[in-house]
Amino acid sequence: MNIDKKITDDLVANDVSFVTTVPCKQLAGVIDEIEARDEIFHIPSNKEDEGMGLCAGAHMGGKRPAIIMQNTAIGVTINTLAALIQYYRMPLPMLISYRGELREPVACQVEMAVHTKALLAQMNIPTYHFHTQADVAEFDIILKYTFMCNKPVAILT
């Protein structure tokens, strides 16, 4: 199974038509697949909180948005998540590469990994962690849940 294609197929099947991304080596294949799809308008962001603002605008314009980002920027997005996305009950699937776990080659990534899940839990953001390739089978139902309950949802990869 091509995971990048499966993720993108699930986005399209759930009418996600706007995706913003921050450069990410771990999710580069997904980003490339999204860029190749005519059904998805892809706009790169400079920063994660900027991307969330773009997603909010897309949502207000009638689109179903998603963001692809790194967990190391969760701290930067707290205010935007709380004061914009959560306050206005905007559904936002957040596909987040989870840096800083075992075998992480960059030491500074480890510090944010220690806080990522706790910050998401403190904000009452439903969080799912894909540990194996088979976990991607859950992505479709997670997207459905996100749009049904009008909440941001974190999917850690």
Language model: regions and residue ranges:
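Thiamine diphosphate
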Residues: 1-157
